[in-house]
């Protein structure tokens, strides 16, 4: 997966509908359901049907950077816009990005491990104060950062979501909880989508089953 070098500003790229995104190549990813066996909640394991998890089957990803900031645009089909909890089984739509915090080959389906933690960027349609930056060292171990270095904006229309994440390539002051990126470098990367109308939340979601390698154009 290529992260294209662009000359546009963060303000421009944060708009999911910006014309600047039309020149950034995209890659379509097949999404799989998270395994029920990996859910930390016994209630979830007992109450969910594995065949009903992972409603979103395909995700389009575009990546770009301007030498200072990195941007990801995630788009997927969704015939319903869910922006709040409206029933016991209806939750807000969301999406996320997963990157190994310290390199290595963490188990993507288990949210990393003690020796190989992962950094997750999380957007959800109901979060009024912005996205979340988290670190995980295995299932059920997610810790939210007090300070989030990420910006995100999502729009829904014509039966689809488009969400853009933006962050400085380097966040040296948060090196223990935010992956450091640089032009010419490469990292493993994964993605997740939560379909709220399908009762998806927490560990119940669609995800990219294998790591992809993201190469940042020099």
Residue ranges and their predicted role:
Residues 65-68, 102-103, 156-161, 181-185:
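A short, structured loop/turn motif at beta-sheet edges
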Residues 16, 69-76, 161-167:
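Short, well-ordered beta-strand segments enriched in hydrophobic/aromatic residues
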Residues 2-41, 84-157, 198, 202-218:
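Extracellular/luminal beta-rich ligand-recognition
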Residues 159-202:
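Ser/Thr/Pro-rich, low-complexity mucin-like regions
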Residues 36-44, 75-79, 168-170:
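Generic short beta-strand segments
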Residues 64, 73-75, 98, 155, ...:
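Residue-level recognition of well-ordered beta-strand positions that form the cores
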Residues 21, 29, 59, 67-71, ...:
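Primarily extracytoplasmic ectodomains and periplasmic/lumenal surface modules that are beta-strand-rich
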